[in-house]
C-alpha cells in the first residue's frame, strides 16, 4: 500500500501555510487572525508528518503532537485576550488593542 507522494503533501502544506499567511496579513478581526494562525500551525504540522512518513521515522508524528499542543495553548491564550478585548472595547478589531495600554 502506497501513500501520497511527498511532493503532493508538501505542496498542500505550503498552500495551507500561504492561505494562513494571507489571512493573517489581510484581516483586522482578531478571531480571523487566530484562525489564520491555526491554519499556519496545522500546515507546519502536516509538513512534519509528511517528511516523517517519507523516511519512515516517527519523529514527524512526535512533532505533530508538539505542534498541536502549542496550538491549543495559543488558542486558549488568544481567546482569553479576545474576550477581554471584546468586553472592554466592544469590538474585535485588532487596532483597538493599541488602546489597552494604561
UniProtKB/Swiss-Prot annotation:
Annotated EC: 7.1.1.-
Annotated catalysed reactions: a quinone + NADH + 5 H(+)(in) = a quinol + NAD(+) + 4 H(+)(out)
Highest taxon of source: Bacteria
Topology relative to the membrane: Multi-pass membrane protein
GO biological process, one term: ATP synthesis coupled electron transport
Transmembrane segments: 6-26, 30-50, 62-82
Major location category of this protein: membrane
Keyword Cytoplasm: no
Listed GO CC annotations: NADH dehydrogenase complex; plasma membrane
Subcellular location: Cell inner membrane
Keywords: Cell inner membrane, Cell membrane, Membrane, NAD, Quinone, Translocase, Transmembrane, Transmembrane helix, Transport, Ubiquinone
GO molecular function: NADH:ubiquinone reductase (non-electrogenic) activity; quinone binding
Top-level class of the enzyme under EC nomenclature: translocase
Function comment: NDH-1 shuttles electrons from NADH, via FMN and iron-sulfur (Fe-S) centers, to quinones in the respiratory chain. The immediate electron acceptor for the enzyme in this species is believed to be ubiquinone. Couples the redox reaction to proton translocation (for every two electrons transferred, four hydrogen ions are translocated across the cytoplasmic membrane), and thus conserves the redox energy in a proton gradient.
Assembly with partners or alone: NDH-1 is composed of 13 different subunits. Subunits NuoA, H, J, K, L, M, N constitute the membrane sector of the complex.
HAMAP family for this protein: NDH1_NuoK (MF_01456)
Family classification: Belongs to the complex I subunit 4L family.
Protein name: NADH-quinone oxidoreductase subunit K
Species of origin: Ectopseudomonas mendocina (strain ymp) (Pseudomonas mendocina)
Amino acid at each position: 500500500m502506497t501513500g501520497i507522494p511527498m511532493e503532493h503533501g508538501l505542496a498542500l502544506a505550503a498552500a495551507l501555510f500561504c492561505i494562513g499567511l494571507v489571512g493573517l496579513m489581510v484581516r483586522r478581526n482578531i478571531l480571523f487572525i487566530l484562525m489564520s494562525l491555526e491554519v499556519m500551525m496545522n500546515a507546519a504540522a502536516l509538513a512534519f508528518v509528511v517528511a516523517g512518513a517519507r523516511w519512515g521515522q516517527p519523529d514527524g508524528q512526535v512533532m505533530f503532537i508538539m505542534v498541536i499542543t502549542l496550538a491549543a495553548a495559543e488558542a486558549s491564550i488568544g481567546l482569553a485576550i479576545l474576550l477581554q478585548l471584546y468586553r472592554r472595547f466592544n469590538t474585535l478589531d485588532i487596532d483597538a488593542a493599541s488602546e489597552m495600554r494604561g
